[in-house]
From Swiss-Prot:
EC number: 2.7.4.25
Organism ancestry: Archaea, Thermoproteota, Thermoprotei, Sulfolobales, Sulfolobaceae
The protein's name in its UniProt record: Cytidylate kinase
Gene this protein is translated from: cmk
Disulfide topology: none
Compartments, as annotated in UniProt: Cytoplasm
Species this protein is from: Sulfolobus acidocaldarius (strain ATCC 33909 / DSM 639 / JCM 8929 / NBRC 15157 / NCIMB 11770)
Protein family according to the UniProt entry: Belongs to the cytidylate kinase family. Type 2 subfamily.
GO biological process, one term: pyrimidine nucleotide metabolic process
Residue runs in coiled coils: none
């Protein structure tokens, strides 16, 4: 079974993907972690790397190609990626978009990254603007168009476990458990 989870920063992508990975006993891969890792190796923050990626398509292309190879080569995988749902929906059994209002996401990011909510809002706005411009320019993808997703969930008032349970219910209803290759 191949599952793609997309959504804006702070929507709960990583938390939900990790829970699903554990409950389904399948591999989890995060484009966000690869991107953060690259920023760390370059000794810059993620906002700065996003800015660099606006002028250098090779940065996004490298990460997206790695994700493409993974989803093609794995029978069972959960891919967590901002743009994965648009790029790889035809290769997945289930594509999911998680969303939440800016203030909710800012609280989550502030808590995770130990920054103020105001700083989190600034970072989120910068990252989202960068993502939207890059993905439109490089791929012709409007990240406001959610029509490619099988499932869209507002995570505002849900715990990650609740979101995972909703997704597991959809998997069960779609009979995707039989798609698991062991």
């Amino acid at each position: 079974m191949k599952i793609i989870i997309s959504g804006p920063p702070g929507s709960g992508k990583s938390s939900v993907a990790k829970i699903l990975s554990s409950k389904l006993s399948i591999k989890y891969v995060s484009a966000g972690l690869i991107f953060r890792d690259l920023a760390k190796r370059m000794n810059i923050d993620i906002v700065k790397l996003n800015k660099l990626a606006e002028d250098d398509f090779e940065i996004d292309k490298k990460i997206d190609l790695e994700m493409f190879k993974l989803i093609k080569s794995q029978d069972n995988v959960i891919i967590e990626s901002h743009i994965g749902g648009w790029l790889f929906h035809n290769l997945s059994d289930l594509s999911i978009y998680l969303r939440a209002p800016l203030d909710v996401r800012a609280k989550r990011i502030a808590s995770r990254d130990h920054i103020s909510e105001d700083e989190a809002i600034i970072q989120i706005i910068k990252r989202e603007r960068s993502h939207r411009e890059r993905f439109l320019r490089y791929y012709g993808i409007d990240i406001l168009d959610l029509s490619v997703f099988d499932l869209v969930i507002n995570t505002s008032y849900l715990l990650p476990e609740d979101v995972a349970d909703i997704i597991l219910g959809v998997i069960s209803r779609k009979n995707l458990h039989s798609a698991l290759s062991h």
